[in-house]
Amino acid sequence: MDGHSYPTSIADISQWSRDNRTTTLQANIRFMEYVVLNCIGSNATTHRGMVLKGGNALRFAFQSPRSTKDLDFTVAGNEIPDDTERLRSLLNDALRFAERRFRVKAKCQHVERKPRPNPGSTRPTYSVSVAYQFEADRYFHNFEERNNI
C-alpha cells in the first residue's frame, strides 16, 4: 500500500483501516469501490461508456478528503443502454472480473431508473446496488444461489 485512497487487495484492508483510522467495515466498502472501479475499467463497453465523477472521483484521483457513499458516473456516448435489464446485464458482465482479480464475487442486486431531475436533463439516472462476498466469507461458495445468479 502506498497511501492509496482505497485498499487495493483483501490483504490490505486491515492495515489500510488502521492507517486511515477507520473501521474494518468502512475499509471493506472502500475496497469494494476500488473493485467496482476496476471492473468497470476492465470491461471494454463500460470503460468507454462510463465516466466517474463526484466526490469519489476527486478522492480517487487526487486523494481529496471529500468522499461520498456512492460512486457517480456519467454516460459518455451511446455505449451504455438506457434500459434497466440491459444495464444490469452489462454491469454484471463487468463485475465478473472481480472474482478472477480480487477473489470477490459481485453482482447487481438492484437497478432502478430514476425520474429525470428536471426537464432539461439529457441523460437518465440509475440507482444501482451491488451485492458482494469475499472469498473468506462463509457464503462465498453459494453466492450465486443466494443471489439468484
Give, region by region, the residue ranges found by the protein language model.
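Compositionally biased terminal segments of proteins
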Residues: 1-149
